[in-house]
Regions:
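N-terminal glycine-rich "phosphate-gripper" loop used for MgATP/nucleotide binding
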Residues: 33-35, 57-58, 62, 66, ...
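Short, surface-exposed acidic-centric catalytic microdomains
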Residues: 26-67
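Active-site loops and adjacent core secondary-structure elements that bind or stabilize anionic groups
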Residues: 201-296
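Haloarchaeal acidic low-complexity proteome signature biased toward cell-envelope/secretome components but also
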Residues: 1-3, 22-25, 187-207, 211
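Donor/substrate-binding cores of folate-linked one-carbon enzymes
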Residues: 87-197
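Short beta-strand segments
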Residues: 7-8, 84, 281-283
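Hydrophobic beta-strand scaffold residues
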Residues: 50-52, 80, 101, 128
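N-terminal beta1-alpha1 ligand-phosphate binding loop
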Residues: 2-42
């Protein structure tokens, strides 16, 4: 079982998410912060995870502070260090004497390194961003990349909107993936060459990872629950017959609901199995009848 030493300066939400998920069976064995009263302390304690606080004394060098951190961590069993919003730039005193150390940065490095990544993204006009899990080196946000996860940027995004999307839709996916790979012994780090190799992270007909992007086609009624909002998304480049792009022939009738789309799509997929004319009846995604004939 891979054990993690987590370092955070604030909430440590990625660390706590990893503790809850235990990707690949990995567990968080210690959470250390450099800030008294950091919220991550409470979250870790609630999960039964040991915590330590090692603040930097006034006038203390970064190297001395990092040596005290390593001395504190020596009391715990861990295989890898994971940073999560740890607001200190680590020197060789830490990097050279700790196990492989990972960090998560809220952009698709090498784009938008450093502080205020979300503001940089919005100012640039970029329409795609995300996060990067990388190996920590002395150069900030420049270590070899382990994995990335992308999310869209919308025209009306504010900083908080983008921050939440990157955290919940990108970081909460990418960091557990990286930890799972480490736990499965699939990550090889060459510290001298500053490279990372991931065993089995291949493409081909059945790639290890997929990214799917669809566009909003229409907003929906849910059906029996009209107070619930819904929407249907589709691949606008699809040339095969499909329900989403089909015209509605019964003029004046209600637009299709969520349940209608599900049932109609099920019926269409069923009749596609036949070469001759076919009809299908679907109710709540369950086939209720199917028939073929020489003509409709």
């Amino acid at each position: 079982m891979v054990k993690i030493a987590g370092l955070a300066s604030n909430r440590g939400r990625n660390l706590l998410h990893i503790a809850d998920r235990m990707p690949g069976g990995a567990e968080l064995s210690i959470v250390l912060t450099n800030e008294d009263g950091a919220p991550v302390l409470e979250g870790a304690s609630e999960r039964g995870i040991p915590t330590e606080v090692v603040t930097r004394d006034e006038g203390e060098s970064r190297e001395s502070h990092e040596e005290r951190i390593l001395e504190t961590l020596d009391s715990y069993d861990f295989d890898i260090v994971c940073l999560d919003g740890y607001m200190r730039v680590l020197t060789e005193a830490f990097v050279d004497n700790a196990p492989t150390t990972l960090n998560i940065h809220p952009s698709l490095l090498p784009a938008f390194p450093g502080m205020d990544a979300h503001e940089q993204v919005l100012d640039s006009g970029a329409r795609m961003t995300g996060c990067t899990v990388h190996v920590v080196t002395e150069e900030v946000d420049a270590g070899p990349i382990v994995t990335q996860e992308a999310v869209p940027v919308y025209e009306d995004d504010e900083t908080d909107d983008l921050k939440k999307r990157v955290l919940y839709d990108a970081e909460f996916t990418a960091y557990p993936r990286a930890i799972r790979w480490v736990a499965e012994d699939r990550v090889s780090v060459d510290t001298d060459a500053e490279t990372v190799e991931i065993e089995g992270d291949t493409g081909g007909d059945f790639p290890q990872r997929r990214l799917v992007s669809d566009d909003l086609s229409n907003t929906l009624r849910y059906g029996e629950n009209p107070h619930q909002d819904g929407a249907v998304y589709a691949d606008g480049t699809c040339e095969e017959a499909n329900v989403v792009s089909a015209p509605q022939l019964n003029e004046g009738a209600k637009a299709l609901s969520y349940n209608n789309y599900n049932d109609a799509d099920g019926a269409l997929n069923l009749i596609k199995e036949f070469d001759e004319p076919a009809a299908a009846v679907i109710k709540h995604t369950n086939p209720a009848g199917c028939a073929t004939a020489d003509s409709l």
